């Protein structure tokens, strides 16, 4: 075990020190005591020992972690699913089928892949719910000049990718805001989905959420079925779509995000409300400008965890 593995680790959480050595010492002690005393009743303590070993071993198995914020670990690709013409969902196996990702809402993971002899690092937001176990789901959109997204597109089941995390600064607490407004664009929906899963899986969280989601075309709207299902099941959540190039069948808003749409669909400024923005830089800057004009207090520097207007 490396030094970084040992640091911050309780030595008794390691199977050798917390299970095998104590169990062996106990068995030897029982054998010696039984031999010297002739009391066979002492052997009845062995089933209790085996129960303790089982509980400790099961706990150690569940404690195995797949992600660390300070070092890389390799995860195996289980499968991939195409969800749009240039986007796919990649499912990676965690170390055990019992493990659930404990990633704070709105935080991301770092991904490292080898390309042309160099290690390229990118950041993605897992969309796996805390209630799901055994896997990590990433949505990756392929870009014409995207080296890492092209690398992902070439992966096959059984291939491995290096991960590190969680990483991020957003702070979210249940019921910390009465009304949460969100502006998202393209693949910027992934951290939003994390937050939505965090809210709707906690019955006590009564935060109202309004989402304004922009894309180039209807086919570019990622995870639309999931978002529509959430909006149907949870009365506190509303979603509004905007597309730049609509089809003849489109009945929603058209164009780019506007100040009027933000004013119409999202909460107004209040100390009890909050605004999150996640998308391409151009959209983020435009949404920030509109937020200022609508009275929101915008931090002039990089967003920090508790900012009322937070840009991912």
Swiss-Prot record:
- Domain FAD-binding FR-type, chain residue ranges per copy: 70-173
Q: Tell me the membrane topology, using the record's own terms.
A: Multi-pass membrane protein
In its UniProt record, a GO molecular function of this protein is: cytochrome-b5 reductase activity, acting on NAD(P)H
Please report what switches on or represses expression of this protein: By calorie restriction.
User: Where is this protein localized, as stated in its record?
Assistant: Cell membrane; Endoplasmic reticulum membrane
| Cofactor(s) essential for the protein | FAD
Q: Which InterPro entries match?
A: CBR-like, Cbr1-like_FAD-bd_dom, FAD-bd_FR_type, Flavoprot_Pyr_Nucl_cyt_Rdtase, FNR_nucleotide-bd, OxRdtase_FAD/NAD-bd, Riboflavin_synthase-like_b-brl
Q: Which positions, given as ranges, span the membrane?
A: 16-36, 40-60, 180-200
Q: What class of enzyme is it?
A: oxidoreductase
Say if the entry is tagged with keyword Oxidoreductase.
yes
| EC number in record | 1.6.2.2
Q: Which residues lie on this side of the membrane: Extracellular?
A: 1-15, 61-179
**Catalyzed reactions:** 2 Fe(III)-[cytochrome b5] + NADH = 2 Fe(II)-[cytochrome b5] + NAD(+) + H(+)
Give the protein's biological function. NADH-dependent cytochrome b5 reductase that reduces coenzyme Q6 at the plasma membrane and mediates lifespan extension by calorie restriction by shifting fermentative to respiratory metabolism, probably through modulating the NAD(+)/NADH ratio.
Similarity-based family: Belongs to the flavoprotein pyridine nucleotide cytochrome reductase family.
Question: Additional info?
Answer: Present with 29000 molecules/cell in log phase SD medium.
Instruction: Supply the name of the protein.
Output: Plasma membrane-associated coenzyme Q6 reductase PGA3
Origin species, per record, is: Saccharomyces cerevisiae (strain ATCC 204508 / S288c) (Baker's yeast)
